[in-house]
Amino acid sequence: MSELKFSPIDEIIADLKAGKLVIVADDPGRENEADLVGAASLISPESIAFMANYGRGLICTPIIPERAKALDLSPMTPKNREAHKTAFTISIDAAEGITTWISAADRAHTIQLLANPNTDASAFVQPGHILPLEAIEAGDLRRAGHTEAAVDLARLAGLPPAGVICAIMHEAGTMGRVGDLGE
């Protein structure tokens, strides 16, 4: 097993600005899971394919509440009973510029549109293959989740406040935990 190394925040921000993916792990007392995280505005088809092939979890796109409201993205359910209150909205796809909706290129295109503050609701159809998540106001200060971390990191990188996350799942189906990520 290789030794796990935690990177300083300035390196993480530089990687996100360069369009790279980083790993964010939450507290062992919460979900104790690790996610691949990228900046939505810079996400590439290659990064989406990497997330699908090696992350293996759901690929989701955290956004700020103002963005969800501007795009008329209603909650997936009117009463969220999930333990961590993950705020899924209705799923979306780009209305134009895609062919299969699910390919890495099509998902990256939809996610980039979602992150672009100049794109309005008419650019999307519902339901779709992209799962936006509405981050909590004040980010990780109020809810220490991957959703808020992705939005906060994008902001710190000077990018639109939108991320892309994918839980890391091992080939056997167990979740990636901090202690076993080096395996």
Feature locations, PLM:
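Catalytic domains of riboflavin
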Residues: 1-183
